[in-house]
Each structure stands twice: as structure tokens, then as C-alpha cells.
Amino acid sequence: MRFVIGGQIEKEKIAETLRRLAGDKTSSITVMGDIDAAMALKSGHADYYLGACNTGGGALAMAIAIVGINKCATISMPGKILLDEEIIAHVNAGKTAFGFTGQDIDAVIPVIIKAIFSS
């Protein structure tokens, strides 16, 4: 699996968390700007996009514009994290771009990764 990291904040923390949790199941984890990351996803150079910002949804602005809303899911926003079952349902529905708040990285990435690698 090839992952790109976009969003406005905590890019290195997302990448480090992903490396720790997914290990050798990933062939690449690349930190990029939002537009480049979304373009990599659309062109098939990446399989998944992860990004954080202060609102959760803002990390997906370029992904929504470039790959479409039907491929994107806001996993957390201030004061609200989706239930694990909801996150898993988004992965199983074929969503490939996920946005969340920086403070929720440790709560949401394990669920996303587990769902990706078990689907």
C-alpha cells in the first residue's frame, strides 16, 4: 500500500504513526502538500491519503476537489470522533482519503489502518 500524507498540521506525526502501525505492509509513505497528495491519489501513484488540520475536514479540501467527495471521509472534528464502526464502514465503502484533527491522530489512525489491512 502506498500512502500520501497531506493536511496542514502534524504531517510527520501521521507518517511516524503510520510507519509504526503498518510497518512493512506499506510500500511507501510520502509527506506532500495537499494538492500534490491529492493528485498522487487521483493518478494512482498512491492508494490512500491521510491528513490532519484543526477542523478535520479542511485537511480534505483539495482531496475533495480533485478526487471527489465520494472518496473522502472526515473521521474526526473538534469534539467528535466517529465510532470505530463508522470509520470501518468508510474504508469498506471504498473511501481513500481521510481527514481528522491533529489531536485525534492516535485514536483514528489505528482504526483506519486495521480496516485497510483487513479489507
Regions found by a protein language model. Give the residues of each.
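Juxtamembrane/disordered regions of integral membrane proteins
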Residues: Q8, E12, S28-V31, K71-M77
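A short, gly/pro- and small-residue-rich
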Residues: A61-P78, I113-S119
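Active-site rim loops that border cofactor/substrate pockets in soluble metabolic enzymes
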Residues: A15-H45
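Short glycine-/acidic-enriched loop or helix-start segments at secondary-structure transitions
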Residues: I14-A15, A59-M62, I109-P110
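Metallocofactor- and cofactor-centric catalytic cores in central/energy metabolism, strongly enriched
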Residues: I5, V31, H45-Y49, G94
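Short beta->alpha linker loops
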Residues: I9, M32-D36, N54, Q103-D104
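Glycine-rich phosphate-binding loop
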Residues: D34-N70
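C-terminal binding/interaction regions
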Residues: R2-G6, K11, P78-S119
